[in-house]
Design a protein with these regions (language model features):
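Acidic beta-to-alpha connecting loop that harbors the catalytic carboxylate
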Residues: 28, 219-221, 246-248
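Catalytic histidine-centered segment of alpha/beta-hydrolase-like enzymes
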Residues: 244-256
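Conserved hydrolase catalytic core segment
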Residues: 86-128
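Conserved HGGG/HGGXW glycine-rich cap/lid loop of the alpha/beta-hydrolase fold
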Residues: 2-65, 79
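Glycine-rich His-Gly loop
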Residues: 24-28, 94, 218
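Conserved alpha/beta-hydrolase catalytic His-Asp/Glu region
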Residues: 148-188
Length: 257
């Protein structure tokens, strides 16, 4: 991957293809989830496909404490500016749904459209009750991480989201992805998974998003993501839905085409 300096940090990125720009923002934990889309001929042959690793992941500048959603959005904007991209279709997965929506709120002229691949519940849910409802799942996982076993914590989280064979499934389309996730555990648990991060999305913010929006969910995903879709419709009436048959939260990692 290439490197670029933006906002005082170095990010890794890659580009493929030509045409209208599409930027993929990865979710929490697995930095290269955009790879299956970037190499997909149906996309690469018609679009300029851009993917990057957020700060704290892979070979990017390591983080010193939590990174805010706004900072991640600023990083994406700065990357696009460095690549001389005035406008891009923004595709996001899981946690990065917050980043993409913040980007659309802060700099709407940069975002041509939004594709939300099962964004995190924090998009539309109050972090405190949400944290309480997820405690039975996240409690044991965080205990493992705080005990110093980052690999077990990563495995516990993604087994809950992706299923027990997630490492084999991810490796099929993102070679080395699970191993990199183990190395990036500190960024996942010390920044991305901190409840709320003082981030808010409501009617005032939603009114600034007038671009086309697509919400993609999997037919085998947790019911929680269906609830998120319903709640987002109240804020974004222009949003369209699509369901990927046979997919869970892995979505495009399980079915790239």
């Amino acid at each position: 991957m290439e490197r670029v300096s933006v906002n005082g940090v170095e990010l890794e990125f890659s580009c493929a293809g030509s045409g209208e720009a599409v930027v993929f923002i990865h979710g929490g934990g697995i930095a290269d989830t955009g790879l299956p889309l970037v190499v997909e001929p149906a996309l690469r042959d018609h679009y300029r496909m851009i993917r990057y690793r957020r700060r704290g992941y892979g070979g990017c500048t390591r983080i010193q404490g939590p990174v805010s959603i706004a900072e991640h959005a600023q990083d994406c904007r700065a990357l696009l500016k460095a690549l001389e991209v005035a406008e891009a279709h923004v595709v996001c997965h899981s946690y990065s749904g917050l980043v993409a929506m913040q980007l659309a709120v802060d700099t709407p002229e940069v975002v041509a459209s939004l594709a939300l691949f099962e964004p995190t519940p924090l998009v539309v849910m109050d972090p405190e009750p949400l944290s309480e409802s997820l405690q039975p799942i996240m409690g044991p996982i965080m205990e493992k991480y705080q005990a110093g076993d980052g690999v077990a914590a990563v495995d516990g989280l993604f087994s809950a989201l992706f299923g027990p064979h997630w490492r084999a499934e991810v490796s099929r389309t993102v070679p080395g992805g699970p191993e990199q996730a183990d190395k990036d555990a500190a960024t996942l648990f010390d920044s991305d998974l901190l409840p709320g991060q003082d981030w808010h999305f409501g009617a005032e913010e939603a009114a600034k998003i007038t671009q086309p929006v697509l919400f993609l969910t999997g037919s085998e995903s947790l019911p929680l993501f269906g609830e998120i879709r319903g709640l987002l419709h109240a804020y974004l009436p222009q949003m369209e839905d699509d369901v990927m048959p046979g997919a869970n939260h892995l979505l495009h990692l399980r079915h790239p085409a």
